[in-house]
């Protein structure tokens, strides 16, 4: 079971959303190739879909095809790679939320005439 964690994100720009998808894809690909040689992977497809409404939804879809002689539980490997990607993306989003939160606080302090 997965629980939902409210990070309290500000509105993200298109570039930030693209970066999140890129990070997730890169983590998955790196994880797969940490466990399999490139020659053992016949085909791989990693898709990230991001929807930002009231919440930020990230859907990751991974397909990996290996030859029959490669002894690996592909489904478990994919699940582990996806879990790792979600962990990395969550850390990245927390940094974004913290950074933007601090920027907003600094702007508010400057507007009110207070400084650190």
Swiss-Prot record:
Ranges where the record places region Disordered: 97-116
Protein name, per record: Uncharacterized protein PH0533
Compositional bias of kind Basic and acidic residues: 100-116
Lineage, highest ranks first: Archaea, Methanobacteriati, Methanobacteriota, Thermococci, Thermococcales
Domain of life: Archaea
Family affiliation: Belongs to the UPF0440 family.
Biological source species: Pyrococcus horikoshii (strain ATCC 700860 / DSM 12428 / JCM 9974 / NBRC 100139 / OT-3)
């Amino acid at each position: 079971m997965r629980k939902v964690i409210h990070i309290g994100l500000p509105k993200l720009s298109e570039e930030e959303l693209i970066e999140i998808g890129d990070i997730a894809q890169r983590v998955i690909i790196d994880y797969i190739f940490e466990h399999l040689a490139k020659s053992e992977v016949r085909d791989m497809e990693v898709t990230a879909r991001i929807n930002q409404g009231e919440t930020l939804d990230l859907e990751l879809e991974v397909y990996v095809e290996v030859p029959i002689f490669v002894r690996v539980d592909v489904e478990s490997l994919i699940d582990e790679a996806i879990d790792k990607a979600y962990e990395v993306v969550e850390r990245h989003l927390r940094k974004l939320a913290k950074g933007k939160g601090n920027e907003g606080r600094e702007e508010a302090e400057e507007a009110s005439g207070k400084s650190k």
